[in-house]
UniProtKB/Swiss-Prot annotation:
Binding of (2S,3S)-3-methyl-L-aspartate, residues: Q172, Q329, T360, C361
Recorded effect of pH on activity: Optimum pH is 9.7.
GO biological process, one term: glutamate catabolic process via L-citramalate
Signal peptide range in chain numbering: none
Annotated protein name in UniProt: Methylaspartate ammonia-lyase
Function: Involved in the methylaspartate cycle. Catalyzes the formation of the alpha,beta-unsaturated bond by the reversible anti elimination of ammonia from L-threo-beta-methylaspartate (L-threo-(2S,3S)-3-methylaspartate) to give mesaconate. It can also use L-erythro-beta-methylaspartate (L-erythro-(2S,3R)-3-methylaspartate), L-aspartate, fumarate and ethylfumarate as substrates.
Annotated effect of mutating Q73A: It has very broad nucleophile scope and excellent regio- and diastereoselectivity in the amination reaction. This mutation strongly moves the specificity of MAL away from ammonia and towards methylamine. It is highly enantioselective
Residues at which Mg(2+) binds: D238, E273, D307
Length: 413
């Protein structure tokens, strides 16, 4: 099966591009927007619409394979690739990539994806968002050629012989950490709520007292609203380094506090993402490693999730090799090609580390569907309900795709 044409269409994402540097410099709020001047190159507003590019590969039998290029909310910040605007990058795909795809015979996913993921133009690698979308489209093309799901393609190439099963779906609330939890309970999210605990004084509490109260509220709310006794979601709270900030990155003090949270969460299991941020990769690994060892030594029913300083496949391997946490977030679309997601999850699994197939609120329904297939095929511990920050939409997209894949795979057994 050959690719006979490549089309690119501009699109919207499930959220927004925010100029992180402008926000950190004190951009003001005005309703849902920000006031003040932009700082990061490419931004025309501090908050502007999130943009995507759909890549459509027309196959010689008339089928169309589809992947979406998308970037994170804080595109252009923190050493990332430039702000991802469709008008800037559609010409790159049409000029540099499409000619290499048109006329190509579709073979296996892995070698084709790796070729385009590693491709350079004028000595530079392609934008991560382009690598993300192109490799999604290639995966869909291979699946359409073989007349199977994308999950089966990934399973056969990366995880041969494995069963394709449902994976727990993780919903995140953003700042609306009370009303959105009610939505999650009604729809029975498997993992919840994220909660966006990114400020010590306002959200964690100077001694952690505010988050402790929230965990107690969360526990009681689930018990009150659940319609069946055996609905027992995992608590996954992202604290953005605030526990380390409140407790001076003291391992024993942080462990004491997390132990208190774990007790308050019972009968539910607790995960804490990003307990500290020590602003250095090596030191971050060591702090996560030592805190995990302390919690495990005490037998605390809590897991740590690595986030800060764990961005690339190499970072994932580094944290995994050193047992720096119990789980790592596999960050899409920062990894570029979706082949890297499969590689990262399989490495985690082979080395006793939990793999969370994550992502961003600022991607699309299509990229969410594709990465859900990959998470299922590789046996991730959880997948993110995405895109958007409304809970309902992301859960619908991810859960429905999962159920479709399970039905199609089951039919072929």
């Amino acid at each position: 099966m050959k690719i006979v044409d490549v089309l690119c269409t501009p699109g919207l994402t499930g959220f927004y591009f925010d100029d992180q540097r402008a926000i950190k410099k004190g951009a003001g709020h005005d309703g849902f927007t920000y006031t003040g001047s932009t700082v990061t190159e490419g931004f025309t507003q501090v908050r502007q619409k999130g943009e995507s590019i759909s890549v459509l590969l027309v196959l010689e039998d008339g089928q169309v394979a589809h992947g979406d290029c998308a970037a994170v909310q804080y595109s252009g910040a923190g050493g990332r690739d430039p702000l991802f605007l469709a008008k800037d990058f559609i010409p790159v795909i049409e000029k540099e990539i499409a000619p290499k795809l048109i006329g190509r015979e579709i073979t296996n996913f892995k070698p084709m994806a790796e070729e385009f993921d590693k491709m350079t133009v004028n000595g530079n690698r392609l934008h991560t968002a382009i690598r993300y979308g192109i490799t999604q489209a290639i995966l869909d093309a291979v699946a359409k050629t073989r007349k199977v799901t994308m999950a089966e393609v990934i399973r056969d190439e990366y995880n041969p012989g494995a069963e394709i099963n449902a994976v727990p779906v993780f919903a995140q609330s953003g700042d609306d950490r009370y009303d959105n939890v009610d939505k999650m309970i009604i729809k029975e999210a498997d993992v919840l709520p994220h909660a966006l605990i990114n400020n010590v004084e306002e959200k964690l509490g100077l001694k952690g007292e505010k988050l402790l109260e929230y965990v107690k509220w969360l526990r009681d709310r689930i018990i009150k609203l659940r319609v069946r006794e055996d609905y027992a979601p995992i608590f996954h709270i992202d604290v953005y380094g605030t526990i380390g900030a409140a407790f001076d990155v003291d391992i024993k003090a942080m462990a004491d506090y997390i132990q208190t949270l774990a007790e308050a969460a019972k009968p539910f299991h607790l995960r804490i993402e990003g307990p500290m941020d020590v602003e250095d990769r090596q030191k971050q690994m060591e702090a996560m490693r030592d805190l995990r060892a302390e919690l495990d030594g005490r037998g605390v029913d809590a897991e740590l999730v690595a986030d800060e300083w764990c961005n690339t496949v190499e970072d994932v391997k580094f944290f995994t090799d050193n047992k720096a946490g119990h789980m790592v977030q596999i960050k899409t679309p920062d990894l570029g090609g979706v082949n890297n997601i499969a590689d990262a999850i399989m490495y985690c699994k082979a080395n006793g580390m939990g793999a969370y197939c994550g992502g961003t609120c600022n991607e699309t329904n299509r990229s969410a569907e594709v990465t859900t297939n990959i998470g299922m095929a590789c046996g991730a511990r959880q997948v993110l309900a995405k895109p958007g920050m409304g809970v309902d939409e992301g859960m619908m997209i991810v859960k429905n795709e999962m159920n479709r894949v399970l039905a199609l795979v089951g039919r072929r057994k």
